[in-house]
Amino acid sequence: MGIDLGTCNTLVCVRGEGIVLNEPSVVAVKKGTNHVLQNGNAVGWVAKEMLGKTPGSITAIRPLKDGVISDFEITEAMLSYFIRKVNGRRPMVKPRVVIAVPSGITAVEKRAVLESAERAGSRRVYLVEEPMDPRHGVER
């Protein structure tokens, strides 16, 4: 299983099937907590559809900022949801996961991605650095 954790969207692909998931990188939680709504299922499209239609006690969190994890616990919940959703056909099988990470992230940030994926139910996690956008860091 390959995962591209994006600031806006997360893509998941499976060997032989291609991209099987393309959902917003957003999680709906009870305001002031990290409690993910709907038993941990208020993630991706479900969370995005809740925006603007829910009481003020619910907030949407984008757990990645500038390509890195800004909220470890929420990223773990998001990864867990996406892995469960894609792997649902084979719940007893823990997938090997390859995750694309920005080339400039620190060792601490890499460890956070690894731990999030491991806790989300992956058997083995591999990180692959993605090339940096050449426009990144250019002054305007």
Where are these regions (language model features)?
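Nucleotide/phosphate-binding catalytic cleft detector across ATP-hydrolyzing
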Residues: M1-R140
